[in-house]
Amino acid sequence: VLYVYLVNIITQKDNWSKIRKLFKRFQKNKKINCVSIPVKSLTKKSDKAEQISNWWKSIEQKSIELALDFDYLFETDISDCYGSLYTHSIAWAIESKSVAKSIKNNSLLGNQVDSAIQSMQYGQTNGIPQGSVLMDFIAEIVLGYVDEQLTKSINLEKISNYQIIRYRDDYRIFVNNPNDGSKILKLLSENLIEIGMRVNNAKTKDSSDVITSSIKADKLERYLIPTTKNPAQQYLITI
């Protein structure tokens, strides 16, 4: 019942318009590219097939392209992303932190979403349910907000030569100066802490072999074995 209620709130005309504008704002910085927004197939392919195709083009293939412009790749993800998400940060993302803190009633969309998710979890403010497209969407709102805050932090540090690809809670940070990569990781960590999340130190790594690091091991092995199926992609990887 609460799930349906939440869907109804979000899809109301004015609320949906507000959320669409929100995502446009989050995507203003072209140096931080979120590629985990669900894709709707406009062809005969299923939505899932289109999503997989988009994943390859937007992450792995784009990473290979960026290897031509950047010398270092830093990778990390978020520890227990959904389980640690602070529900009040949903309201901060939708309304701004100052507005959400000053107006705490349910007249605001952000507060309505926050309250509904708390109700799903017996009043808990830490974590959101997993396993649904709706919760993936809610997570993207909060992580888009983090992208926006990270942009502000990076600008204050006057770092300009970088590119970030984010697939939900997985980050790939491309830089030419390794010090910039370390600084961006630190700034990301600081902004995540603000919403109750933490960088996963066990999965944080950096490499100067950008191409090899950009491709999953099983795929890398497949592409390096001679075959005629994907000659263009093989050539791009092996040159």
Residue ranges and their predicted role:
Residues 1-130:
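Conserved two-metal-ion catalytic palm core of "right-hand" nucleic acid polymerases
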Residues 23-27, 102-111, 155-166, 200-205:
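Short, glycine/acidic-rich hinge or "gate" loops at secondary-structure transitions
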Residues 62-67, 163, 196-197:
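A general structural signal for short secondary-structure junctions and capping/turn motifs
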Residues 71, 123-134, 168-174, 239:
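Glycine- and acidic
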Residues 78-81, 167-171, 176-179, 202-205, ...:
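An acidic- and aromatic-residue-enriched active-site/binding cleft used to recognize and process polar
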Residues 88-99, 145, 187-192, 207:
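Amphipathic alpha-helical scaffolding segments
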Residues 102, 137-168, 173-176, 181:
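Active-site palm subdomain of RNA-directed nucleic acid polymerases
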Residues 182-239:
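C-terminal polymerase-core module
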